[in-house]
């Protein structure tokens, strides 16, 4: 079975959140036979989950950590070797190659569709930073 993680770029990290992720992942491995974890990027939640799953991998070495890229369809061996220090495999789904600016959204949709279990981090009080005004879109 496959699990994935989706969450805000910025999170309010705490020991409680880390412990909740750890217990959830252990339960999925031990009770639901989840053995593959898909990760995205550009998210503090992804980073925390990768760190937690990597720690658990020391106890459950059969699990796999897969980095699903949203950019760089073709990577050289040096970059791949770098990624494989943290993950067991990496790839970019076919449908993402032509997604343009929506590549990260398309990647997340792909991971949700591919997974049997999705672990979400959602903070209803989270407000993403405002984008700066551009030449054609001025603030008033």
Annotate each PLM feature:
Residues 1-140:
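Acidic/glycine-enriched connector segments
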């Amino acid at each position: 079975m496959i699990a994935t993680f989706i969450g805000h770029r910025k999170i309010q990290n705490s020991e409680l959140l880390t412990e909740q992720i750890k217990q959830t992942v252990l339960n999925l491995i031990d009770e639901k036979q989840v053995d593959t974890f898909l990760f995205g990027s550009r998210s503090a939640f992804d980073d925390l989950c990768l760190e937690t799953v990597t720690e658990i991998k020391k106890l459950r070495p059969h699990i796999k950590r897969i980095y699903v890229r949203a950019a760089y369809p073709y990577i050289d061996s040096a970059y791949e070797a770098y990624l494989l220090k943290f993950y067991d495999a990496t790839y970019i789904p076919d449908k993402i190659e032509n997604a343009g600016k929506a590549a990260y959204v398309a990647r997340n949709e792909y991971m949700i569709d591919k997974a049997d279990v999705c672990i979400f981090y959602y903070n209803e009080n989270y407000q993403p930073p405002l984008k700066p005004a551009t030449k054609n879109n001025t603030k008033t």
